[in-house]
Amino acid sequence: MNKRSIIALSTFLFVVLVTLFLVSKLQTRELNSRDYIQSRTPTLFFHGYGSSANAEKHMVEAARQAGVTQTIITATVDSHAQVTFKGDIPKDAINPIVMVEFEDNRNANYAQDGEYAAAVVRKLQAKYAFKKMNFVSHSMGNMSILFYLLEHAQNEEFPKLQKQVNIANHVNGLEGMDLPANLTILDNHTGQPSAMSNSYQKLLGLREIYPQDQVDVLNIYGDFKNQSDGSVLNVSSRSLKYLVIDNAKSYQEKRVTGPLAQHSQLHENPEVDRLLIDFLWGK
């Protein structure tokens, strides 16, 4: 093959690749309106203990790749509850995502974690004046948003929570730590557990103040082995139901199995990605 032929072939292949790329981008834009709602409501992602916004990247990128949104920012909150944004949300942004990062990420004072979450919501509200929002949380991030709700669920100045995705939540204790002995679910209809950890008892107030007929709740837990994700018993995760079922607009549980059902792998799990994408943004 002579030099001219090589150049011609290279040019042809380049044009083909560019065309395929543009077609792919157009298909992604089509998905935005065909398969997913077109909303200005932001979705906030909260990571777990000792973690960072990196733990949220797989889920967020899955949403972006699916064509849900092209607007992703990071909100970092320090130990003084001061919030810094990286990126901006345009006025016409569709389904914007906020990746929340706690610098004080090993603080097991859940009430304080809840105030860190409140600081992010407050700053987001002040800058963008959103009326509604969604939450996605993993592991201790669940405690952050639940204790946030315990203090601020009825705060009329904050955006109203619309959808809540809880992943690998340990609302009624962690194995080897604060898990009540012989924990079971006494009543599958109400979700009432047989025993309650100290933190769970503090959250019982949610049964009274959780927003009435406002929030759709998706509770995802992993059955990696022996009805546990390796760190949290399924019965602890499922204890969430008792706190919200009487007031939630809807409540559903999803059990995930397989190697990626392990506690720290759930936020890297394509099945979890699909569950939360369909729940939050599916038409």
Indicate residue ranges for each PLM-predicted region.
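Lipid deacylating catalytic domains
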Residues: R4-F12, V16-V136, M140-K283
